[in-house]
Amino acid sequence: MLATMIATATLAQGVVDVHSHIITPEFISALDKEGRLMDEGFPLPKYAVAEHLKWMDEAGVQTSVLTLAAPQPSSAEVVRQTNEAAARIKREHPGRFLFCAALPLPDVSKAIEEAKYALDTLKADGIKLATNVRNSESHQARLNGRVATDEDEVNVGGQYLGAPELDTLFSFLNERRAVIILHPHRPEPVNRQVMQQTPLAMQEYLSETTRAVSNMISRNVLARYSHIKVIVPHCGAYLPLAIPRMKSLTPVMQANKMVGEIDWEANLRALYYDLAGAHSPEVIRMMLTITTPDHLLYGSDYPYVASQVLTQGLVRMKKYLSDETDLAPFREMILYQNARRLFDASQPTKGSDTSR
């Protein structure tokens, strides 16, 4: 009995990882057919549930939240297959996995349909959204055997979060009190020289995330849809620098009719931040200039980072969260409490009213 109680207590305090990715054979095959395996500037890592669980056990991670990796496939069928695969993993390993479902954007009607299916039938714990999604013309160019030209990419562009066309989707997600996990994707168009020396993940991913969140704030999206909670990846990207600058420029933008009223408090209150990437005490302190400790979450970015590196990074985080006197009070909050509270709050209660 005592052993069971100790084991249960240990599991209850296990780390929650809100940033991990599922990579299925169907996903890889679809990208290969579209000629997009190297879209992000680096090859996709291999993924196996057994290896994921092995790392989680070694590192002391109790629960991982799965999301579809970048880039976004153009096939709604592949998106559905990935969501069903993630749901199956969650079902087969209760307590070890949650998942946030991908959507087949930019088709908003299909996206809402998939969100309903994922949340109601697959019991998804939230929704994953790309910072931008492209239309199908550049995909079709590749499928037809030619590389998309600069003209294709300029004409296609990328539809960023915050675009008015997505209001219907955000209204639905607001009704469902959804947790949304953001992830940066390749910007459209992208100068080919950008990736000559470094992959997109090094710099453009941070720019993409900052751009998408700034776009949502500028349209007051998270104030208008106040039941939505958004997890921003990679230590908040450039937002600790961008938000003060955006605030200072808002009067000028308003004077030039570029933006309307922005409820800064409401928008920022909706944002949570994972610590995947180059976390450190200094980074966390910088993030606390734009948020509060109850909005910080542990994230690994598994399997894009080697297991050994992730384990060492988590050990280092636990140590500085214990040793740094100003951060020590937030240790359990960051490692597991905030994530559990966030995802528990996203689950609908019977008869709940989300219309207000």
Predicted regions and their residues:
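Glycine-enriched alpha-helix->loop->beta-strand junction motifs that scaffold or abut catalytic
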Residues: L122-G126, E175-V179, T198-A201, Y225-H227, ...
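Hydrophobic faces of well-ordered beta-strands that scaffold small-molecule active sites
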Residues: V16-S20, S64-L66, L98-A101, I127-L129, ...
